[in-house]
């Protein structure tokens, strides 16, 4: 229907994955993820799906599914010559699995996620840059730490920098990180 290939949709027992999003008076959000069917994804299943994207140049993976399934997808994407981007939302309770960042061309984390992953509070541009360097030190080729209204800090093999955010008055920041990742992937 409408040219959408649904042949890879797998029906499993249980409910669909759900995210409950609470938005405060300032427009900031807090998200609780209930994996549901997302938790059934396996490395073999995700790796097998990469062939469906022949001709694609970028694989973008969030962590709303089991991290080992993300690793399987990244391995296959890399083998297919794709550039890989990982959005660290939400950070798994046990942190990132071994090898995930080694398969990542660009890792994207917000201040909270970057702090959880690097063990240091990210409160300003300097601490965001420290976190970006730490993420690169763990294997990612490049790292971006988003800072909400203060834009983003980035670190690549060619250098580091800051990109300002477009000034807006937010009503609701739900999906801001997802939108950032999508726009980055689209180039």
Task: Locate the predicted segments by residue.
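Conserved N-terminal subdomain of the carbohydrate kinase-like
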Residues: 1-58
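Conserved beta-alpha-beta core of the PfkB/ribokinase-like small-molecule kinase fold
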Residues: 56-130, 150-152
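Short gly/ser/thr-rich secondary-structure transition/capping motifs
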Residues: 2-3, 39-44, 86-92, 163-164
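Short, acidic/turn-prone active-site loops that include or flank metal/cofactor-
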Residues: 36-38, 89-91, 112-114, 166-169
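Short clusters of small/polar residues that mark proteolytic maturation junctions
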Residues: 34, 121, 164-165
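Conserved phosphate-binding/catalytic region of the ribokinase-like
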Residues: 93-94, 98, 102, 125-187
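Beta-strand->loop->alpha-helix junctions that form or flank phosphate-binding loops
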Residues: 7-16, 87-89, 134, 144-147, ...
């Amino acid at each position: 229907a409408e040219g959408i290939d649904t042949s890879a949709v797998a029906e499993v027992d249980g409910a669909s994955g759900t995210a409950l999003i609470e938005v405060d008076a300032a427009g900031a959000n807090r998200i609780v993820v209930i994996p549901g069917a997302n938790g059934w994804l396996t490395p073999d299943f995700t790796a097998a799906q990469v062939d469906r994207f022949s001709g694609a140049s970028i694989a973008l993976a969030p962590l709303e599914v089991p991290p080992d399934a993300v690793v399987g997808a990244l391995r296959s994407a890399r083998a297919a010559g794709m550039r890989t981007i990982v959005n660290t939302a939400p950070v798994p309770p046990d942190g990132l699995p071994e090898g995930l960042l080694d398969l990542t061309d660009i890792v994207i984390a917000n201040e909270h996620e970057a702090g959880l992953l690097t063990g240091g509070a990210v409160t300003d541009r300097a601490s965001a840059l420290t976190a970006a360097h730490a993420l690169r030190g763990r294997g990612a080729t490049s790292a971006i730490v988003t800072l909400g209204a203060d834009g983003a800090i980035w670190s690549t093999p060619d250098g580091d920098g800051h990109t300002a955010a477009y000034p807006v008055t937010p009503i609701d920041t739900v999906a801001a990180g997802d939108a950032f990742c999508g726009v980055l992937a689209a180039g």
